[in-house]
Amino acid sequence: MEKLSHGLVTSRNMIRYKSSQLPERVLQFGEGNFLRGFIDWMIQQMNKQNVFNGRVVAIQPTPHGKVVPKLQEQDSLYTVWLRGIADGETVDHHEVITSISRGLNPYTNWQDVLEVAASPDISVVFSNTTEAGLTYLEEGYDKEKAPLSFPGKLAACLWHRYETLGWGEGSGLVIIPCELVEQNGKVLKELVCRYAKAWNFPQEFFTWLERENEFCHTLVDRIVPGFPSDTADECFERLGYEDILLTVAEPYHLFIIEGSERVRKLLPFNEAGLHVRWNHLEKHRNMKVRVLNGTHTFMFALSYLSGVDTVGEAMADEQLCSFIRKGLFEEIIPCVDAPEQEVTAFAETVLERFENPFLQHRLTDIGLNAVNKFRTRLMPTFNDYVAQTGEAPTYLLFSLAALINYYRGVEEDGPFLIGRRREDSYLIRDDLEVIEAFKVGWQQVNTGKLSLAQLCEDLLSKRELWGVDLSMERKVVDKVAESLQIIVEKGMRQAISGVLNQIGGNNHVHKQ
């Protein structure tokens, strides 16, 4: 079977517009499933309507990335396949995406990245490096070498752009982070300034950064499972070609941007019929991150270690679905600051999206950087629940115990760990200090130096993992330790059954 390439799409007349002639207008940090199935897909829709007319240069965000070589192998082409239900109708539509001009590895081609960053054609920056990407890493500045962190790379790129273009018209950029971090634009800007200060950039750079550049707050919403591993051959047969970057996504999409009129004119999403809202972000952000992303993080470890592989399989499993719904409706929803009827309706819609039979959203993908995700997506709910009830949330803490068990590595894979579920193995990937904490903790359990209860107390005491010292609350430690003990001794299924049998609806938080 032929592989996706420029030659293939040309010979089959699959592209109806001259995308290869469009200038590079977007610098994008990240090239993973989400950006390809959301931002780059949106740019393609605008290009098709002749309202943006630009392409993306995708930058590999970490040294361990594997997408850029695949982009190069396929002439920067890939397919987005939208599958699901929209407005009561089945959507099953695929198209070749041509909005990426090239992918660059900054660790081997840093000067090429800087050259793109200084191009007058570049007007906007997008990023999605996960919550773990918007952090500060102590590192020096070397103009010949890419910084390791994303904010460091962006600071270096902006400095090079300023050095090259100065205060000329159009020298500044619109910077739109898509990471699920509250006030992500402000957070990223502060990190860039912190690097610039540490690297002794001159005051005039800070003035230019403030006056000519705009950092936007955003909220993104689309489930993008990415490559359909289990049905790839069947998909290739339907497509008529092989695509190693095939990206499956749901039809639903929502992009909320807090930005000026400058941003609206630069990115006329709405003119292309895209579901993009401007401003009024905070209410929807709180609801979406806690209900959708929070539930994903809540469910992934306990579901995967119960023997299922995807979100859809978990929702189709009676026991798991019951547990997930109880955790969502009894502990997460009551802590969302919005009218209960509105939140409940949104939650039911989210569960319908989880049940999408066309998607294979792998739980192990949700499990990447899971400790970071737990801290940002579930700890705010945990804190609110404790404040409202004075009690420790049973379902959330069981999920935390499942996460601790999920992070039990059996071998190392470079800087990361490999976990095992019976005959299956999975990658445990997170910040290096997170990996080290779990690796050392589980090694001490394996050698008899720590009991499971002591492991829990040790891990829960680490503020760098959870944002607070969870070991200060004895009942929190006891609940997590008890759940972990049962999970390890009797298995995840029996542990879940025990929680479901113990608890009725009496721990529901009632809003005032």
Swiss-Prot record:
Keyword vocabulary terms for this entry: NAD, Oxidoreductase
Single GO BP term: mannitol catabolic process
Molecular function as annotated in GO: mannitol-1-phosphate 5-dehydrogenase activity; tagaturonate reductase activity
Reaction(s) the record says it catalyses: D-altronate + NAD(+) = keto-D-tagaturonate + NADH + H(+)
Keyword NAD: yes
Binding-site positions, NAD(+): V26, L27, Q28, F29, G30, E31, G32, N33, F34, L35, R36, G37
UniProt pathway: Carbohydrate metabolism; pentose and glucuronate interconversion
GO CC annotation: cytosol
Keyword Transit peptide: no
PANTHER family registered for this protein in UniProt: ALTRONATE OXIDOREDUCTASE-RELATED, MANNITOL-1-PHOSPHATE 5-DEHYDROGENASE
Protein name: Altronate oxidoreductase
Protein source organism: Halalkalibacterium halodurans (strain ATCC BAA-125 / DSM 18197 / FERM 7344 / JCM 9153 / C-125)
